[in-house]
From Swiss-Prot:
<keyword id="KW-0808">Transferase</keyword>
<dbReference type="InterPro" id="IPR044923">
    <property type="entry name" value="PolC_middle_finger_sf"/>
</dbReference>
<dbReference type="GO" id="GO:0003887">
    <property type="term" value="F:DNA-directed DNA polymerase activity"/>
</dbReference>
<comment type="function">
    <text>Required for replicative DNA synthesis. This DNA polymerase also exhibits 3' to 5' exonuclease activity.</text>
</comment>
<keyword id="KW-0963">Cytoplasm</keyword>
<dbReference type="InterPro" id="IPR040982">
    <property type="entry name" value="DNA_pol3_finger"/>
</dbReference>
<keyword id="KW-0235">DNA replication</keyword>
<dbReference type="Pfam" id="PF17657">
    <property type="entry name" value="DNA_pol3_finger"/>
</dbReference>
<dbReference type="InterPro" id="IPR004013">
    <property type="entry name" value="PHP_dom"/>
</dbReference>
<dbReference type="InterPro" id="IPR012337">
    <property type="entry name" value="RNaseH-like_sf"/>
</dbReference>
<comment type="similarity">
    <text>Belongs to the DNA polymerase type-C family. PolC subfamily.</text>
</comment>
<dbReference type="Pfam" id="PF02811">
    <property type="entry name" value="PHP"/>
</dbReference>
<dbReference type="GO" id="GO:0003677">
    <property type="term" value="F:DNA binding"/>
</dbReference>
<dbReference type="InterPro" id="IPR036397">
    <property type="entry name" value="RNaseH_sf"/>
</dbReference>
<keyword id="KW-0378">Hydrolase</keyword>
<dbReference type="GO" id="GO:0005737">
    <property type="term" value="C:cytoplasm"/>
</dbReference>
<dbReference type="GO" id="GO:0006261">
    <property type="term" value="P:DNA-templated DNA replication"/>
</dbReference>
Amino acid sequence: MVFDTETEKGKRIWALSQFLVKKNILDHNELHQLNNRIELVYLENDRENALFLVALTLKKPLTIDIWNALYEGFQDAEGAELRITFQEDATFFKDGSTKSSVTLAIIKDYFKSFFGKDKKYRILLEQELTHPNFLSYSNHELKANCQSQELDQWLIEQRQAFIKWMHQAGFTHFGFVSLFNPPAEKQLKVKSMKVSKYDKQFETEVFSTEFVPIHKINQQMDEIKLMGQIFELKDFPGYNNLRNTLNIYVTDFQLGGSLILKWFYKDPKTIEGIKIGTWVKATVKVERDAKTQLLQGIIKEISPIETPAYYRRPDQDKQKRVELVFHTKMSAFDGINSVQEYAQFAKERDWKTIAVTDKDNIHIYPTLYEVAKKYGLKAIYGLECNLIDDHIKIVSNPDKTKLKDATFVIFDIETTGLHGRYDSVIEFAGIKVKHNREVERMQFFLKIDGPLPAAVTEITKITQAQLEDGMEQQAGLEKLRAWLDGCVMVAHNGLSFDLPFLQTQFEKYNIAPLTNPLIDTLALSWALNPGFASHTLSNICAKLKFDFDDERLHRADYDTQALKKVFDYFKEQVELMGITNLEQLDQELNQQCHFELLKRTFTNTGIIYIKSQSGFAKLYELLSIALTDNNATRPLVLTSTLQKFAKSFVITDNPVQGDIFKAALTKPLKELEAAIKRVDFVLIAPPGAYAGYTIREGLKKEAIPNAIKLVVDTAQRLNKLVAVASDAYFIHPWENEYYKAIVCAKGLGGRWHRHFNYKEREQRVPNVFVRTTGEMLNEMSFLGEQLAYELVVENTNKLAKQLTADDLVPVQTKLQPPVIEGSNENLAAKTWSQAKAIYGDPLPKLIEQRIQEELKAIIDNGFGIIYWISHLLVKQSVQDGYFVGPRGSIGSSLVANLIGISEINPLVPHYLCESCQYFEVNEEVDDGYDLMVRDCPKCGAKAAFKGDGHNIPFATFMGFAGDKIPDIDLNFSSEYQAKAHAYVRELFGEQYTFRAGTIATVAEKTAYGYARNYFEIIKQTELATAPEIERFKQKLVGIKRTTGQHPGGIMIFPNHKSVYEFTPCGYPADDTSSDWKTTHFEYDALGNTILKLDILGQDDPTMLKHLGDLTHVNPQNIPRFDKKLTEMFWSVNPLKLKPHYLDEPTGAIGIPEFGTKFVRKILEQTKPKGFGDLIRVSGLSHGKNVWADNAQKILKDQNLSLKDVIACRDDIMLYLIHKGMQAKDAFEIMEKVRKGIALNAKEVQLMQSNGVEQHWINSCLKISYLFPKAHAAAYVLMAWRIAWFKLYHPLSYYACLLSFKLKEHDVSGFKSGVSFVKQKLEELNTLYRIKRIKPKEAELLTSYEVYLEMMARGIKLEQISLTHSHATRFVEHNGMLIAPFITIPGMGEAVANSIIEARNEKPFSSLDDFKKRTKITKKHIEAFTQMQLLDEFREQDNQKKLF
């Protein structure tokens, strides 16, 4: 606005303008805050009148000095005009301040002639202020608006003048963005994102004129230059000598700022410098992808560049601050970064210490220790937790006043806000009651300074006019104080809001505080009505059937009347419980309803830090108690528990959500002092971290720094050290968008994040990134330079020194197994006795030597207990009638085989006579199961000379020195697994046995959904391109959702120690009804310390048990040598199929580990000749980079056999030793290859010097992972036994296969015949080939393959029978299979079992009888009808009608 300096208002403005341009008015370190300004820029399509924009975005706020220098610079150029504009309703104060926004502008107009017309060209440098003493952080833009793009060259010339002025002003880094309007065919409207006025946007790096921000790229652009960071690479190989395509995903971290760049290349060397995390600049042609219709950039030129300055965020201060509050991805739905990212950030800024304070968990401790050690950092171990008093107040200041004699004042207040120190009471209403009779009412309004906020009027319907007729604050507060005195107060949420608000107001006006009792009806409702989902006054009235008008809600007089009805009802209820006075009311309800009160009560967010090594066990116990005994909808740390362990910790409140800061806003000074005295030191945060209070709770912005100062002043007066923390949930300011996405995601149990406003569908996120030292000093400079430095730098370093004085190690590293007396002796005795029972006495030297070596390694290294426990478990399972399946790498151990925990004999191939124990090594085969059964050459016993031994070195299981902790997997029947778990607990005791805990995190598909949901909530779906969603998805993956448990892992802790010396414990998914507790740390963190048993439940052992039961054949007696069975793995000939039924060359369908399409292809190509070859196929199929482009190519190109390629890790060691290499060298090469670690030149040369073939060496160099031979042998043994039943007992085999292995069925489809099943199979195979098949369809595909094979073998499958079907299993009946009830669509086990139970009681007499005695539904009846299963009932009903 133009102002007249002769008017009074004009004079004030002019005086203010002079103040602003004076030099050195502001302190040099004073920083400035800003409102956000959202601008719409319209680019017209008229060429002559086109708008041209040059924008300069500054990286830091402008001080008065800089404004003055710029002003002088413009004047030096050609003269300039200084303007200051105010809003019309600006309010001025004596100190010259204003509550309105102020715009400071330096303006220079030029006139140039174009197209024969004079056009105005304006330079405008402007900044919006919220207060004369505070200048803005954002929107520092130098704008040049002109009428035509012909001005381009002239503007470039002017750029030099701009640069001169900016240098004069002290800026060294800045640039320009040139935006031209698009072609005239379309009118383009450039929209800025709509954001809340409170939503602080991070400042973006300045782009020079050559680069276009990615989110502004559109189809009208042709060739552009951009820059960004690579966050994903996808390489697509070209075929038939065509070029390869590399999709490079880049982002500049602005919302919508991700793009796929396509690079076509032939030579792989050209892409060597293109790596994830690299910043690049590129010249690209903009076009739409023909398939996805997404904008993409076709690369013409690309090169790496340095990370732009803004994104480097260096910490240049000599003395660094220490960040004390940081939340990682392990804070459920509340952290964005991994601890690795955090440590790298710290290391790059030369920080020495990092702290982690995740919420309600310390999962990160083991990783934090390892990462800190890797980066050379010290670690501070913290826990953010919910602190709560043991006693939940229902009554404040309770005494023995009898309920029947008390005078109650039921009251309510309406206020301008939630914060007693910064808001005011505007209405009071109360009803005084004695002996159940109303004796007096009071209601009045109170005046306030300034206008009544519109939001308050909207909620309460109270108007400014009503307040103007009200009482002055002092008088009104004194009046209500006097009226309340001597009475028992009653208020809803009175203990948390009404009472502290009034007490704070009394303190403000020097009025004596209230000391009389107050009953909080909110807490009373929690205790009396545990079934209520909500305890708002309106909801309680609705539940109790009291009239309540929501339109009149939030008026003190109306709320009070409603509350009186509620309180009268509650009083009757407690009197019926025998409660007669206030003290009883408070004490007895706490005792009777303690858990319900804990569930609902508001908690204090505290932070506990470990200060010594002994503190870990104390913290682990404290957290365990919170996660188990005191887990009331969230883990709670009770005051009594904290006091018990307090000496081991350093304790404080969270700087933002803790009671200290809340007290500074809402409570009297006395309560603030009490909160501060309770902690060891005080944490505060920078103002940006408190934005939640201004956004969610309507707190005035100026209250934040005032409250911070109050906390600091009070703490220092009480001699408490004060430090500043970011209270960070992500590292960089631009990661705010990821945090918003997780804030918008609904958490477990349907809970919304505290920063998400569900009603408005809006996230309201504070600026909670990790500040560098300079950033934090700037933001805290309102405290003054010296005090800010003390709190930000000096005190954080003091605390860090205290908290890292010890060399803290959160997890133990030495194996500490449980103790069973005599376990080592029993193991040795069992091993020797069993060996002699099998191989005779004396033992063959080979066997005796192997046992001695193994037992020495096992017992000397403390592993005997592991073997013995496993032996006891398997023995118990076998005694209970359940076969235990083959078990992993343990098969490398002969001791394990002899004591019964492994069926894999690792000796060299050999013969053994079952009659005379004659032992003979055979070197003609490489697997003992490939030795034909013979008559014994010594005693002549018929068919007693049988082969065994799979030639597996012990070193592959327990290391060359035998000191590697054995990982024993026990595959029990899924029907027996729970009993096996219970047996372990019985052996060692509940306090020493826990399920291995796991952490369930956000998976890729879930992260994708969260990202899409975020863009929908902010109504910016046009920005949700595939690469942008990919960027968000990558950041959201891995965030903790909840905890879980390993499917079979049982952790056994030493019975002479406490579990808390190793880990906290909890319940899976915080389910306190769970039968098992879990370890808080995952197995990987405890694997070198605590014994873990993998007691897995699998369908294969279950299937074998039932096959044995059906056929009366013991699976362990199945022949080891069977050429027909071997052939069935790769040929259908042994199955004697009907022709033209099945387009499948192998007989492996349905055989575990061999039935997949991938393995069947390997079988088809390799045609294994025996058991040893089947082990190789298993190794090839389970390894990584072992078959495709490796063994497959070698077999094809060099005409070799399976025994000539590397299939399992043991092959390497055995072959290299065979070639003459030292065993230790062979072992070390095997270890590197099986882990995918590249061999060095020396190791390759060593192999070459020992005559190892080049194709064999090349194969080693390609391998990423190799399967252990013992594991492969175990898989093959299980497959072999099941395959034997398939060949010789087909009906029983298919009954068990369909019952236990196939998850999806189409019995009607089977009945429809071969053509139908073939058609369905072809449809699903097509989906499989194009990778569009869904999980359920994939299951059906396997089922249809089995159906066709059954048909080809002449096996019939009949529909469900009401008289013969089982609930869940396919059963044999009259030479065919009968389907179970569970195959009916939509029928679960409970309903199916109800039919069996009812049928076992007596036959069904009618349809009504069938419905009445089972749990079937209308839909089930419809399904039964369609399958004609109810026809017999209709016949029965018709016969009844005849008679």
